[in-house]
């Protein structure tokens, strides 16, 4: 299971434990409540979660944001918002939402933390801020499942390649290669082997 699917799966498991999830609108009831003003705040939260579960991250973010403006949601819900921003391609906003609260999430399970660190790391990466991405990818490798480590190690290698440190990039590529071989990630294996060849040629 790749990192994106694991992120979604993990957060869905977390959401299941929330009391508000027990309540579900029937189709008829949802049809009646067409206006956001018709929803109670508990229903808005439930609707935000429903959008998230169906992969509608933009819609989920709108609902979470409305509640955050009214109540200033706790760090966990703010973290969910950050993940929504990441999936919605709002990378700067994802960083702004997640990075300041990471220190408040230390009590959470390691893999939940891994999700948040990866979202920050990959947001920096996609913004071409490679030097900022590296420490968050490194933290992710300490928290994530073993079959996810190769992805972050590979991306750290790419970061160092863009930063001009080819020797360090190769070290991370080799380490990532070991994980991809271990978990039989054939697509990544081919890609990283090409990267190693290019690095050697340089």
Please tell me what each predicted stretch does.
Residues 39-66, 70:
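Alpha-helical segment of the N-proximal tetratricopeptide repeat
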Residues 103, 161, 166-184, 190, ...:
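TPR/TPR-like (Sel1-like) alpha-helical repeat modules
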């Amino acid at each position: 299971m790749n990192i994106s699917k694991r992120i979604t799966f993990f957060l869905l498991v977390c959401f299941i434990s929330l009391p508000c999830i027990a309540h579900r609108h029937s189709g008829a009831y949802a049809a009646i409540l067409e206006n956001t003003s018709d929803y109670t705040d508990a229903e808005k939260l439930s609707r935000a979660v429903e959008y998230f579960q169906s992969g509608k991250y933009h819609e989920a973010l709108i609902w979470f944001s409305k509640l955050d403006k009214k109540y200033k949601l706790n760090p966990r819900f703010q973290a969910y918002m950050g993940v929504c921003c990441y999936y919605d391609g709002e990378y700067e906003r994802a960083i702004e939402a997640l990075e300041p609260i990471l220190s408040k999430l230390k009590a959470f399970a390691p893999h939940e933390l891994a999700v948040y660190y990866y979202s920050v790391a990959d947001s920096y990466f996609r913004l071409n801020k490679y030097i900022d991405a590296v420490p968050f990818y490194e933290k992710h490798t300490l928290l994530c499942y073993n079959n996810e480590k190769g992805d972050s190690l590979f991306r750290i290698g790419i970061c160092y390649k863009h930063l001009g440190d080819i020797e360090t990039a190769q070290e991370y590529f080799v380490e990532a290669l070991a994980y991809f071989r271990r978990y039989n990630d054939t697509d990544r294996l081919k890609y990283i082997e090409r990267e190693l060849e290019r690095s050697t040629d340089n």
